[in-house]
């Protein structure tokens, strides 16, 4: 899967303009999440595609739901996110190795209830 490295100037924008819900490189502060502040969680991460193209981004509907490393690495017990999904580092690496944007992968987010995995597999 193609990737880019977070720099000290990397932000995920929540500004109400053309940069809403996109990655922005800026020397000045941008409204939204300063991605470098989430180290080591964002050592490996990807965007689930929530409220992103090909659908039109809708301001106020929320920005990215990232799938990122749990912290401390490899331990998902007692870990909280800001609305993202945290999984062990080795699982993120496995996912990044097999995800292919040309195959249009998608992310199903929900609660684990009886029959849920069967329903998801039906897709």
Predicted regions located by residue number:
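Cell wall/extracellular polymer interaction/catalysis modules
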Residues: 1-81, 91-123
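Short, conserved phosphate/pyrophosphate- and ester-handling motifs at nucleotide-, phospho-/glycolipid
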Residues: 88
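Short cysteine clusters
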Residues: 84
């Amino acid at each position: 899967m193609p990737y880019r490295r977070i720099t000290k100037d990397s932000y995920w924008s929540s500004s109400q303009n053309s940069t809403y819900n996109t990655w922005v490189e800026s020397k000045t502060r941008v409204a939204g999440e300063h991605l470098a502040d989430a180290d080591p969680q964002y050592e490996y991460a990807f965007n689930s595609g929530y409220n992103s193209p090909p659908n039109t981004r809708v301001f106020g509907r929320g920005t990215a739901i990232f799938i990122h490393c749990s912290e401390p690495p490899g331990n998902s017990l007692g870990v909280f996110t800001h609305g993202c999904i945290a999984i062990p580092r080795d699982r993120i690496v496995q996912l990044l190795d097999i995800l292919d944007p040309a195959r249009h992968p998608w992310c199903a987010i929900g609660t684990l209830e009886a029959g849920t995995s069967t329903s998801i597999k039906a897709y």
